[in-house]
A protein has these predicted regions:
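Short glycine/proline-centered loop/turn elements that form peptide/ligand docking sites
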Residues: 81, 104-107, 124-129
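Conserved catalytic-core motifs of GNAT/GCN5-like acyltransferases
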Residues: 22, 97-100, 112, 117-134
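Active-site-adjacent structural segments surrounding the nucleophilic cysteine of cysteine proteases
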Residues: 142-180
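Well-formed, non-transmembrane alpha-helical positions, independent of function
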Residues: 5, 109-110
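Acetyl-CoA-dependent GNAT
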Residues: 3-72, 78-83, 87, 91, ...
Length: 180
């Protein structure tokens, strides 16, 4: 029922990188995620947003957001985005991130109007090799991110960076640690 409606909306909304039945089943049952739906009075699916949460971090991610063509322009995308942000705050996230195609101007307008700001790009991100613009928004302006400065320590072996990474982490946590 619901997965069929989600798959139908997915097929009508995206030309590439569509979620499959297996993707939806995993995300709805096993992942640390929330799938929020917008429906009309008859129970027809108008849109959905899929948000992912990472245990042990303050990051959340909009994985997918789609609104049916007939329901666009009615504020449904904005309402879904706001609902995902509220859910992320309940999950103790204070930063929401997402990726969007640079040619998806309607989505970019939605995200920028909601306070999302670009902070980077992924090259060759989508199936068709187009890039993605990365956006983020601080959901909790009252939460100040930790100022952890990690000093650089050059790798001393040619086979792994593990020891150097461990040294940098130790120095960041205990500044009096001597590197070298």
């Amino acid at each position: 029922g619901d997965i069929d409606a989600l798959l139908d909306l997915e097929a009508r909304s995206f030309e590439t990188d569509r979620l499959t039945r297996r993707n939806f089943q995993y995300l709805l049952t096993r992942a640390h995620a929330a799938c929020l739906l917008a429906e009309d009075a008859q129970g027809n699916l108008l849109g959905y947003v899929l948000a992912l949460f990472r245990r042990g971090t303050s990051l959340a991610r909009i994985y997918s957001l789609a609104v049916s063509a007939k329901a666009r322009g009615q504020g449904i995308g904005q309402a879904l985005l706001l609902a995902a942000e509220r859910t992320a705050i309940e999950e103790h996230a204070w930063l929401m991130r997402l990726e969007v195609r640079p040619d998806n101007q309607s989505a970019i307008r939605l995200y920028e109007a909601a306070g999302y700001r670009p902070f980077g790009r992924y090259l060759d991100y989508y199936e068709d090799h187009s890039e993605a613009v990365r956006y983020q928004k601080r959901l909790r302006p009252d939460v100040v991110p930790p100022e952890t400065r990690v000093p650089y320590y050059s790798q001393t072996t040619d086979f792994t960076c593990g020891p150097a990474a461990l040294m940098m982490a130790m120095k960041a946590l205990t500044p009096e640690t001597e590197l070298g």
